[in-house]
Regions:
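Early extracytoplasmic/domain-onset interaction patches
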Residues: 20-91, 416-434, 438-445
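Secretory-pathway-linked proteins and extracytosolic
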Residues: 22-33, 154-170, 175-306, 419, ...
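Solvent-exposed beta-hairpin/edge-strand motifs
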Residues: 29-31, 90-116, 171-190, 458-487, ...
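Cysteine-centered nucleophilic/redox motifs
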Residues: 73, 147, 176, 292, ...
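Surface-exposed, acidic/Ser/Thr-rich flexible loop segments
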Residues: 85, 92-94, 140-193, 498-579, ...
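A surface-exposed beta-strand-loop module
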Residues: 102-166, 194-229, 282, 429, ...
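Hydrophobic/aromatic-rich core segments of domains that either
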Residues: 279, 290, 325-410
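Long hydrophobic segments that form regular secondary structure
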Residues: 396, 406-516
Length: 644
């Protein structure tokens, strides 16, 4: 019996440790500073090496393999900002069973090596809601020194995982080593041309991705930098298991379908639906869905916690309180009761994650929408300010998993059905008092699509200060001394039964700073009347693909009344024509302004549009010229000169 126990103990120890790569992987025994070029010396910090190892190890006493992750980084810090960014190390403890080892050291310019004092490693809980961390400060960090960190953790087995290889500083060499031995697995890299190489590690099958000279990710306007990082996703299955991507997606479709497509309508839902449509006839599917959306967002509260009752349909209907997941059950009940066909869409915020239909990772399943196929319109259940219409702008352009009532699924890019959904129409009538002391601007504006949604939400939900700031935007941002003579807004209610009803605003303002005395003449800063404009001026090479918040269009007509006894000069500054022509020959972005003289009036027309939210990175300069054209118009001025 004793021999049997000893044999089992030996078996456990050998099967869980045999050929494990992390046990032999180590840093250089005699470290030296690495060579970096003059340009790299100008950076606050540079990653000499950023290596991540994911190692799945078969375990004969359990069907689940063991999972080890090793992180090895060498960072050169060139200034105080670099030191501040890297001299404290955080090791996430999410799903960590145990810490195998943690090592760190600094190598000074003189070659002095300072090792981490293990007593300095502390454990902190729930750091900014990111979970628990091991944390330690790096000692002995000098300018132009290197910080090297190497640690391994054993984690709870999980089929899926992901790892970001890019950082907000340059990485000279990034490596991702995926060791799975005889286990079935899949791995995929995003946003790089480099591919995985099949290698052997201690006789085990492995795949290695090496990428050199990764530029630091930067925040850029019209971009989704977090979602654009070079990254890896992977899957590794238990012994003898091999699940296809379609099997993963089918499983999700079945589980979600059973939750949100009801077989029967409960009595409380029937009672609610009768109230929703009471006195209303000849309702289209759009109006039915709109009434449901309005009722739910006017009567239910979404609560952010893990209370299981908030996902129970009867509890939700009785208490009018739900989780963002549970509220989908209410939509399902009401829409089915009204015979409105719908589909559930699972997708992700494109500013955070790019949804990939070809590789299943649960981290992509972040956001739910409801799609009404007959109307080609979406409901965003968790967006209190939104109502049925086009897809939310943070989802637009991402792919989604569409699930129908029979639990079948398909993938589709989430597009904007109406190309002119978001647009602004603005008419202005500009006049001057007799002595050119001030200018009066009368404006009539219509805001459609996301513009109208934002306007209604701000005026309905914002603080008094927020409303004041938005009123400033609506009456002419950038005109510092303006006096608001009149202001009236229409269609301000967030609850609209018709598709894309415009938010309207009529205003009258006066300003003195738009005029400048020039002897017997007056300079009128006419460009400022269109409000503050974006400018794209970038000295460094563009990193991110171009993604606008959403497609949009602006159509302005500006009438300037010429005072009697004056002529006008400098009108040529009002003529601008910049465009971006797609590969198929269609203009997909344009800014065009022009004018004509009609007796004592200058009639200025401006047309600016962006028919898509995605533009080619390789043609950034053309896109930039269109964006900057509006800014150029904003600087335009004309001269009123007294007629002799």
């Amino acid at each position: 019996m004793i021999k049997k126990i000893a044999f089992i103990a030996l078996l456990i120890s050998t099967t869980s440790s045999f050929a494990q790569h992390f046990r032999t992987y180590d840093w250089e025994k005699n470290p030296k500073l690495h060579e970096i070029n003059k340009e790299e010396q100008k950076e606050s910090s540079i990653a000499i090496l950023k290596k991540h190892i994911v190692e799945y190890v078969s375990n004969v006493i359990s069907p689940e393999p063991k999972l080890y992750e090793t992180e090895h980084t060498i960072i050169r810090v060139n200034d105080d900002n670099g030191i501040a960014q890297h001299n404290t190390v955080y090791i996430p403890m999410y799903e960590v069973r145990k810490v195998v080892n943690i090592k760190a050291r600094t190598i000074s310019p003189s070659g002095k090596v300072v090792l981490l004092n293990q007593d300095n490693i502390k454990e902190v809980s729930n750091v900014e809601e990111y979970g628990d961390f091991k944390i330690f400060a790096i000692e002995g960090v000098e300018l132009n020194s290197e910080i090297e960190v190497l640690y391994t953790v054993e984690k709870n087995y999980e089929i899926y995982g992901s790892q970001t290889l890019q950082a907000n500083y340059k990485v000279k060499e990034a490596q991702f080593l995926f060791i799975t031995g005889k286990l079935e697995s899949n791995v995929k890299a995003y946003r790089t041309l480099e591919t995985f190489e099949e290698v052997k590690i201690n006789g085990d099958n492995a795949q290695l991705l090496t990428i050199k000279d990764i530029p630091g990710m930067v925040e850029e306007e019209y971009a989704t930098p977090k979602a654009n990082n070079i990254a890896v996703v992977y899957q590794c299955f238990t012994e003898g298991q091999n699940i296809t991507q379609n099997m993963f997606w089918t499983n999700v479709s079945n589980n979600v379908g059973r939750q949100f497509f009801p077989e029967t309508i409960v009595s409380q839902a029937t009672e609610d639906v009768n109230k929703i449509v009471e006195g209303k006839t000849d309702l289209t599917n759009f109006k039915k869905a709109a009434l449901v959306d309005i009722f739910i967002k006017s009567n239910y509260t979404i609560v952010k916690n893990n209370n299981q009752e908030l996902s129970d349909l009867n509890y939700i209907l009785t208490n009018r309180s739900s989780s963002d997941y549970g509220i989908l059950k209410v939509y399902g009940q009401y829409l089915k009761a009204l015979d409105v066909e719908f589909e559930i869409v699972i997708t992700a915020n494109r500013f955070l994650t790019k949804f990939d239909p070809e590789f299943f990772v649960p981290g992509m399943l972040r956001d739910f929408l409801i799609y009404i196929p007959s109307e080609k319109k979406y409901i965003a259940p968790d967006r209190f300010e939104g109502r049925i219409g086009e897809a939310p702008f943070n989802i637009l352009g991402n792919y989604g998993l569409f699930i129908s009532s029979d639990f079948e699924h398909y993938f589709s890019k989430i597009i904007q059905e109406d190309p002119d959904y978001s647009r602004i129409r603005r008419d202005m009538n500009i006049s001057f008092n007799n002595d050119f002391e001030s200018v009066k601007i009368e404006q009539d504006q219509d805001y459609y699509g996301h513009w109208s949604e934002t306007s209604r939400a701000v005026l309905s939900l914002s603080t008094e200060q927020g409303i004041t700031e938005y009123k400033d935007y609506l009456t002419g941002s950038g005109i510092e001394d303006k006096e608001i003579l009149s202001y009236e807004a229409f269609n301000t209610d967030m609850n609209q039964l018709e598709y894309n009803i415009p938010f309207k605003v009529k205003t009258t303002i006066s300003s003195e700073e738009l005029l400048e005395d020039a002897g017997d003449s007056y300079i009128f800063q006419i460009g400022l009347v269109i409000g503050t404009q974006s400018e794209l001026y970038q000295e460094t090479e563009r990193i991110n693909p171009i993604e606008m918040i959403y497609p949009n269009r602006y159509n302005y007509e500006i009438i300037v009344n010429i005072p009697e006894g004056y002529s006008v000069e400098g009108l040529e500054s009002l003529i601008i024509d910049k465009s971006y022509v797609a590969r198929n020959g269609e203009k997909t972005a344009k800014f065009e302004s022009n004018y004509k003289l009609e007796k004592n009036k200058i009639v200025i027309t401006i047309e600016e549009y962006y028919k898509t939210h995605e533009f080619d990175l390789n043609r950034y300069e053309e896109f930039r010229e269109v964006i900057n054209a509006a800014s150029d118009f904003n600087k335009a001025a004309i001269l009123f000169k007294a007629v002799e």
